[in-house]
Each structure stands twice: as structure tokens, then as C-alpha cells.
Amino acid sequence: MGVEVSNKPNVSSIQSYVEDLEYKVGLITRNRGLESGTESAGTKGLIIGVVSAIVLMGIPLALYFLMK
């Protein structure tokens, strides 16, 4: 008797690989989402900082020129 050869795919191992792949893709997309949130918060903070600096520097300069 020889070794039996089967053309049937091993469905359980394929499902296991798919589940692992879905898990890893989920982690990658979660990390990307968290990173984009951090980047948008950093950009928002930068914009608020620039506007605040312009206002805080503009008020004394405006008063200085108005008092002349």
C-alpha cells in the first residue's frame, strides 16, 4: 500500500490563517486610527497656539500704535 494523496484542501488550517490575518489587519487599522487621531490633535494644537500667539502679540502692538 502506498501513501494516500488527497486533493481536498485543509479547510480548518485555511480558516485559522484567515482568522490570524483578520486579527493582524484589525490591529494595524486600529493603530493607524490612533495615529491619525494623534496627528490631528497635534495639528489642532499647533493652529490654536499660532492664533493665540498672534492675538497675544497683536493686542499690545495695537494698543501701542493707538496710544501714539
From Swiss-Prot:
Keywords: Cell membrane, Membrane, Methanogenesis, Methyltransferase, One-carbon metabolism, Transferase, Translocase, Transmembrane, Transmembrane helix. The keyword DNA damage does not apply. Part of a complex that catalyzes the formation of methyl-coenzyme M and tetrahydromethanopterin from coenzyme M and methyl-tetrahydromethanopterin. This is an energy-conserving, sodium-ion translocating step. Belongs to the MtrF family. The complex is composed of 8 subunits; MtrA, MtrB, MtrC, MtrD, MtrE, MtrF, MtrG and MtrH. It catalyses: 5-methyl-5,6,7,8-tetrahydromethanopterin + coenzyme M + 2 Na(+)(in) = 5,6,7,8-tetrahydromethanopterin + methyl-coenzyme M + 2 Na(+)(out). It comes from Methanocaldococcus jannaschii (strain ATCC 43067 / DSM 2661 / JAL-1 / JCM 10045 / NBRC 100440). This is Tetrahydromethanopterin S-methyltransferase subunit F.
